[in-house]
Amino acid sequence: LLCSGSPFLYYGEEIGMKGVRGSANTDANRRLAMLWGDDSSPRDPEDSTYPSSKQTNGTVESQLAQEGSLLRYYCRLISLRNRYPAIPRGTYTQVNLGSAKCGGFLVEYEGSTLCILHNISTDIPFTVDLADTDIPCRSILEVIGMGEASLEGTVLSLAPQTSLILGSAAP
């Protein structure tokens, strides 16, 4: 969702719904009824065999009420796409930080530049001096994910499983 273009979300993905095609030549197990959480009782498609007991991530209703849920995370990412038009419309250039676990993009759009960085490590924080990179952005606009980020002078620290958006000013 933090890339250019028009993202596609398959329904249920935003709440972590599970399903599998298996060996059957049908999509019935991937087109299960949406788990809204209200009193409605939608039925799964005919011929579906995926056990409802494996749907362990909750419903739309329960995830909307839960801070930090997958659905709230998706809502935040969509909000960021709307707040920063450069994300869906900009020109992307890869940023090489010399790390297999941290990287990202410079995004240019209508004279402004954002930098979107991701630390995909599960346990190792990432630190870089932005003065040693081609990243012109020096202000943290957004922190997304599991941890924190900080910018002390030009030294950026990014926690594991965390992304951020850098810019020169708020949109």
Regions found by a protein language model. Give the residues of each.
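Loop/helix patches that line or flank the sugar-binding groove of alpha-linked glycan CAZymes
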Residues: 1-115, 120-127
